[in-house]
């Protein structure tokens, strides 16, 4: 249905259409990324509505996956921007317009649905920009301002991050002053072998508790 | 009948502090010291008890467990905190054996209440997630008769003294009603006053939860889920597992007994 080629003169259903100009690659790439994104978003929504929340780390992992997918979608959209902007979809004559009128209107819809319109309006209102005035310089400078704020915040976080030691037993301050046992400094929680050893088996203790005998020694403590 | 859902593990002595720190941090609760004296009595072998009843059903004789908590003033220690547990490396508990030996014979008003319990063998089944065990427990507050003591009380019930042990350790009362117990056990060898460490160089870990009714499947499932959650949280550090059910069989003259 979505194609840029001019429609052939005959409205014959057996007619071969020329699909070569359909930007299939662009559409497919976007479709795939959108499918991924909707999938992860609905998974997060389902998880959040559960009675007991999943572990924080799995939520965080999901969120970061979703953000990656979102940025990948944005970059794909940017990449195919020119192609998509000049693409006009229209129904082929063979499309059953009467039978699938609802589907057709959904597919052909160019106007945003009211919810989307609302949040776009909200976002514009919150940004405090005057889009009506078409003062592009002002908008440009606002974006620049926003970017520089983000960069400053990122710098700050990185600097704060470097101030702390997230691994080992010593603080960054202690490490820079070289206090403490250098052996312990290489202690890493993830690879630590601080696992407890088992000096005896649970079963042998329980056998003693319930039957008065030690499996290991085979000597009866009971008379 | 009360159902006890439990999971067990063991740790060595060196891991005690880290485990306490781990559980404190995970639960936000502090460890509580506990100590108790246990005496397990056997059914009197002199009584010829039929193995089947009138309805031709199997009669199984079970040992009975008597437990009394040991008051903290009897502990030979300066500080009453979980730190006591790190100092219990010897062959005996930090409690006078004379006191422990007198417990069974003491009588009169000063006698502390005893907890009397019978433990069934844990439920069988391959895909069990936790150890499920039925318990009947009652509290004996006082005993009557001319020579009143818990021993004469047991004799009236048809039980003879068996073996005894002291359990001392620290426990956490976690949310969802789970009790996380880290303890040491010592066997007492009768009047000689001799004791030996059962959990030498280590601690027994027990995480348990009691469900009042065996028919309350919802609570049992919920408790199982809570214990599983704890197990998951401690995974890769402490492996909480289900012990061999045969080791928790308190029936007399049964299969692996004697």
UniProtKB/Swiss-Prot annotation, chain A:
Component of the Mediator complex. This is Mediator of RNA polymerase II transcription subunit 8. Keywords: Activator, Nucleus, Transcription, Transcription regulation. InterPro entries: Mediatior_Med8_fun/met (IPR019364). One of its GO terms (molecular function) is RNA polymerase II cis-regulatory region sequence-specific DNA binding. One of its GO terms (cellular component) is mediator complex. It is found in: Nucleus. The keyword Mitochondrion does not apply. Component of the Mediator complex, a coactivator involved in the regulated transcription of nearly all RNA polymerase II-dependent genes. Mediator functions as a bridge to convey information from gene-specific regulatory proteins to the basal RNA polymerase II transcription machinery. Mediator is recruited to promoters by direct interactions with regulatory proteins and serves as a scaffold for the assembly of a functional preinitiation complex with RNA polymerase II and the general transcription factors. PANTHER family: MEDIATOR OF RNA POLYMERASE II TRANSCRIPTION SUBUNIT 8. It comes from the Eukaryota. Belongs to the Mediator complex subunit 8 family. The keyword Magnesium does not apply. It comes from Eremothecium gossypii (strain ATCC 10895 / CBS 109.51 / FGSC 9923 / NRRL Y-1056). Pfam families: Med8. One of its GO terms (biological process) is negative regulation of transcription by RNA polymerase II. Gene3D superfamilies: 1.20.58.1710, 6.10.250.2610.
Curated annotation (Swiss-Prot), chain B:
It comes from the Eukaryota. Disulfide bonds: none annotated. Pfam families: Med18 (PF09637). GO terms for molecular function: transcription coregulator activity. One of its GO terms (biological process) is positive regulation of transcription initiation by RNA polymerase II. Signal peptide: none annotated. The keyword Zinc-finger does not apply. One of its GO terms (cellular component) is mediator complex. InterPro entries: Mediator_Med18. It is found in: Nucleus. Keywords: Activator, Nucleus, Transcription, Transcription regulation. The keyword Oxidoreductase does not apply. Belongs to the Mediator complex subunit 18 family. Component of the Mediator complex. Component of the Mediator complex, a coactivator involved in the regulated transcription of nearly all RNA polymerase II-dependent genes. Mediator functions as a bridge to convey information from gene-specific regulatory proteins to the basal RNA polymerase II transcription machinery. Mediator is recruited to promoters by direct interactions with regulatory proteins and serves as a scaffold for the assembly of a functional preinitiation complex with RNA polymerase II and the general transcription factors. This is Mediator of RNA polymerase II transcription subunit 18.
């Amino acid at each position: 249905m979505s194609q840029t080629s001019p429609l052939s003169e005959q409205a014959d259903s057996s007619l071969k259409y020329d699909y070569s100009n359909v930007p299939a690659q662009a559409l497919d790439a976007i479709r795939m990324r959108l499918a991924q994104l909707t999938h992860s978003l609905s998974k997060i929504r389902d998880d959040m509505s559960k009675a007991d929340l999943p572990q924080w780390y799995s939520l965080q992992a999901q969120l970061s996956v979703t953000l990656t997918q979102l940025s990948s979608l944005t970059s794909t959209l940017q990449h195919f921007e020119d192609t998509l902007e000049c693409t006009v979809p229209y129904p082929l004559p063979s499309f059953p317009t009467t039978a699938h009128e609802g589907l057709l209107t959904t597919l052909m819809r160019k106007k945003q649905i009211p919810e989307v319109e609302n949040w776009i309006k909200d976002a514009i209102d919150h940004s405090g920009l005057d889009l009506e005035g078409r003062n592009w310089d002002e908008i440009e400078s606002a974006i620049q301002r926003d970017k520089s704020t983000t960069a400053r915040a990122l710098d700050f976080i990185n600097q704060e991050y470097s101030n702390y030691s997230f691994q080992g037993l010593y603080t960054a301050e202690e490490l820079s002053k070289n206090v403490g046992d250098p052996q312990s400094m290489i202690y890493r929680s993830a690879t630590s072998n601080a696992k407890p050893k088992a000096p005896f088996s649970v079963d042998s203790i329980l056998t003693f508790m319930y039957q008065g005998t030690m499996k290991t020694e085979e000597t009866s403590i009971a008379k | 009948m009360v159902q006890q859902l439990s999971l067990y593990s063991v740790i060595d002595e060196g891991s005690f502090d880290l485990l306490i720190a781990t559980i404190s941090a995970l639960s936000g609760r502090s460890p509580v010291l506990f100590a108790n004296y246990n005496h397990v009595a056997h059914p009197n072998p002199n009584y010829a008890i039929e193995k089947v009843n009138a309805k031709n059903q199997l009669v199984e004789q079970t040992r009975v467990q008597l437990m009394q908590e040991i008051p903290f003033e009897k502990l030979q220690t300066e500080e009453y905190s979980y730190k006591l547990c790190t100092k219990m490396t010897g062959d005996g508990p930090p409690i006078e054996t004379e006191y422990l030996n007198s417990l069974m014979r003491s009588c009169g008003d000063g006698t502390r209440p005893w907890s009397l319990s019978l433990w069934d063998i844990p439920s069988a089944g391959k895909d069990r997630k936790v150890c499920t065990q039925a318990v009947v427990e009652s509290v004996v507050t006082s005993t009557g008769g001319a020579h009143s003591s818990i021993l004469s009380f047991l004799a009236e019930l048809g039980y003879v003294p068996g073996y005894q042990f002291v359990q001392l350790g620290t426990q956490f009362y976690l949310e969802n009603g789970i009790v996380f117990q880290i303890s040491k056990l010592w066997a007492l060898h009768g009047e000689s006053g001799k004791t030996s460490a059962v959990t030498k160089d280590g601690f027994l870990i027990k995480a348990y939860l009691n469900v009042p009714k065996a028919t309350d499947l919802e609570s049992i499932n919920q408790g199982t889920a809570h214990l599983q959650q704890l197990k998951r949280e401690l995974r890769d550090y402490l492996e909480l597992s289900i012990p061999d059910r045969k080791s928790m069989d308190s029936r007399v003259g049964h299969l692996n007994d004697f």
